[in-house]
């Protein structure tokens, strides 16, 4: 289910504060955040935000196509190593 329209999009207050400070600064730096639940706003476009995946912060460059999505959508939390192939299986006889 999606969020109610009357509530509007959510973004962490601390993240918005960091983004506003970054917009005023001349030098672009990576913004570190733990807020995977925050919605990407148009003011985030062009910034690099390091999103926490449970182990480390993964840098994500924000583009126009990402607006409206959540930050956590672009950083997977689980590492997929692939399914075991049939050649690797040993047959016990």
Swiss-Prot record:
GO terms for molecular function: rRNA binding; structural constituent of ribosome. GO terms for cellular component: cytoplasm; small ribosomal subunit. The keyword DNA-binding does not apply. Disulfide bonds: none annotated. GO terms for biological process: ribosomal small subunit assembly; translation. The keyword Protein biosynthesis does not apply. Keywords: Ribonucleoprotein, Ribosomal protein, RNA-binding, rRNA-binding. Pfam families: Ribosomal_S19. Protein S19 forms a complex with S13 that binds strongly to the 16S ribosomal RNA. PANTHER family: RIBOSOMAL PROTEIN S19P FAMILY MEMBER, SMALL RIBOSOMAL SUBUNIT PROTEIN US19M. Belongs to the universal ribosomal protein uS19 family. This is Small ribosomal subunit protein uS19. The gene is rpsS.
